[in-house]
Amino acid sequence: MVFIFMFLFAFSVFPQTCRQLAKEVKPTLSPETRKAYDVKLAEAFDQFTKQGGNADSTIWLGRRTAYLGNYKDAIRIFSEGLSRYPTDARFFRHRGHRYITIRCFDEAIRDLDRAASLVKSKPDQVEPDGLPNERNVPTSTLQTNIYYHLGLAHYLKGEFDPAYAAFMQAFNIAKNADMQVAAANWVFMSAMRLGKSKEAAQFIGKIPDNLDLIENADYYKLIRLYQGKMKPEDLLKEAASNATIGYGLGNWYLYNGRREETMKIFRQIVAGDQWASFGYIAAEAELKR
């Protein structure tokens, strides 16, 4: 009886963390993709062992673990890395991303704020892609990813002022069109939520036509929608199976007073299978507000 009391008392004194309570939904992967990811994870573990768990090998082990949907395990790996490399901003950046994935937004903000402070006044660095694009050209950097994910975490909490500031920082330091387009999409949406429709229109209107993009065509389509160069009907079919397009289109309806259509699209997104995508997480957050 005493043991039971002490056990229950311990749980009352030490409540479970968001990570412990969070849901984890693994992605739907084809057998071929899963096999390829498993091979890459095995290679990452082999490098981790051979290199004595140095910073680079630990980060790759965490990233490869997350690609298979083991987000909490990835967070634990990044946390272990931080215990050995507490001033390496990359660990806070990647752990912050995966806290967003499991909907622990406060934890994500703390990590990403810390990452931002660690890279302040330092040169930026290209971030290698774990899932290379068709040109095998990385499109993001450590600092753009820190501010981009920080903006997302604030946005998902409905904190649009700091979201706007973080996305604008990501946009301003972006070194290529792909990252600029991704950040610009969220700058626009944050500004619209703040009631800055004139400022949002002026900003998004400056994004040029015919950009040479490698991987962010979806965000570019949404920008063209906001610019009035595409119609919502042009994206409806794609929105049914693409959470990124769906969330942007739902917001366009919201900005134009068509709330019923907005909610319909958001519900359609969360009925799908893109649980870890930012469009899905954002639609889910909207429906809970």
Regions found by a protein language model. Name each.
Residues R63, H97, L152, M189-M192, ...:
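Residue-level recognition of tetratricopeptide repeat
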Residues V13-W60, Y67-L68:
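N-terminal leader/linker segments that initiate helical-solenoid repeat arrays
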Residues G52, P86, K120, T141, ...:
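Short coil turns that delineate tetratricopeptide repeat
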